Amino acid sequence: MALSSRYHGKILIVTAHMTHIDAAVAIQFKDEIRAEIDDNAQHVILDLAEVNFIDSSGLGAIVASMKQLKGGRKLDLAGLTPTVAKVFQLTRMDTVFKIHTSVDKAL
């Protein structure tokens, strides 16, 4: 699995370096993103610009990551490709997450 993270001020940016988040990788993705998010991160941006496909298992992993953040901490999404954005729209997950066109716009 390929995730990287960096801080921009107090904002943690986690980038997914993969083309698919599906049932085959969802559990590992969830575990790795949880490991990337430390207790100091009050605001997390998940950069999905490299992801071209996501299924319900992938959505579930992202929702689980959001639920890990408690006490006013938040998870925003950035850089969704048109295909991934469509999945978020069809499942109405676009009403659950704040979605930005890019990481720069999310900052």
Q: How would you describe each model-predicted region?
A:
Residues I21-F97:
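Amphipathic alpha-helical interaction surfaces in cytosolic regulatory modules
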Residues K98-S102:
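Short acidic-hydrophobic, aromatic-tinged amphipathic segments that line or gate anion-handling sites
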Residues M1-V14:
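Short beta-strand/loop segment at the start of cytosolic alpha/beta domains
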Residues K105-A106:
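Short alpha-helical segment
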Residues H8, A16-T19, L80:
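Generic beta-structure capping elements
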Residues V14-A16, L46-D47:
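Conserved beta-strand segments of the P-loop GTPase G domain that flank and frequently precede/overlap
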